[in-house]
């Protein structure tokens, strides 16, 4: 990897400064929803820091940054299921959705990570939210693999 930047700060420190700058900007329409210490005094930081930062080092000299500006409230709907090999993934997901109840801000989008350890599955679920899926096109042409079949089974009625 041949990538350098002129700073003595860590990646996390630079990202946190960027998040603070963005959330404190007068034109920012997003709500600050991160607390300093979730266990004791739940005081809002008012700048959505500290940010959650995942770093993946790959060969080359390019830098690719994906940003999800979301509050911690979206984590309130997170579900982790450790399934047995005989369990049906689609049945599990469809069984969990009604338990989520109200309280999520539209649009409701599910990120699903399958396989690996618990922490890896949760990261995969977050990363899946960056993928583009045209569900109407998928339904029209039909699924081409097992993952696409799962997408069509997970599509919920709109009424």
Q: Which positions does each model-derived feature cover?
A:
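Flexible, glycine/charged-enriched surface loops at secondary-structure junctions
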Residues: 24-37, 99-111, 135-146
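Short acidic, glycine/serine/threonine-rich loops at helix termini
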Residues: 6, 78-81, 119-126
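Conserved phosphate/anionic-ligand binding catalytic regions in large, soluble enzymes, centered on
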Residues: 1-5, 104-120
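Conserved small/polar residues in nucleotide/adenosyl-binding loops
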Residues: 152-158
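Internal alpha/beta scaffold segment
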Residues: 15, 75-104
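Gly/Ser/Thr-rich active-site loops/lids in small-molecule metabolic enzymes
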Residues: 14-15, 19, 86-92, 121-148
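A generic, well-ordered mixed alpha/beta core segment in the N-terminal half of proteins
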Residues: 2-61, 66-68
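Active-site-proximal helix-loop elements at catalytic-domain edges
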Residues: 61-89, 147-150
């Amino acid at each position: 990897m041949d990538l350098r930047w002129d700073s003595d700060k860590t990646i996390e420190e630079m990202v946190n400064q960027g998040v603070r700058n963005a959330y404190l900007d007068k034109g920012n329409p997003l709500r600050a929803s991160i607390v300093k210490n979730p266990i004791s005094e739940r005081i809002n930081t008012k700048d959505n820091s500290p940010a959650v930062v995942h770093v993946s080092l790959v060969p080359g000299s390019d830098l690719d940054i994906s940003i999800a500006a979301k509050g911690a409230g979206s984590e309130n709907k997170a579900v982790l299921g450790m399934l047995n090999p005989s369990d049906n993934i689609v049945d599990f997901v469809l069984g969990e959705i009604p338990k989520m109840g109200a309280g999520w801000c539209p649009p409701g989008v599910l990120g699903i990570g399958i396989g690996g350890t618990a922490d890896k599955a949760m990261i995969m679920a977050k990363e899946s939210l960056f993928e583009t899926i045209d569900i109407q096109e998928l339904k029209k042409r039909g699924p081409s693999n097992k993952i696409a079949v799962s997408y069509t089974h997970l599509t919920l009625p709109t009424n």
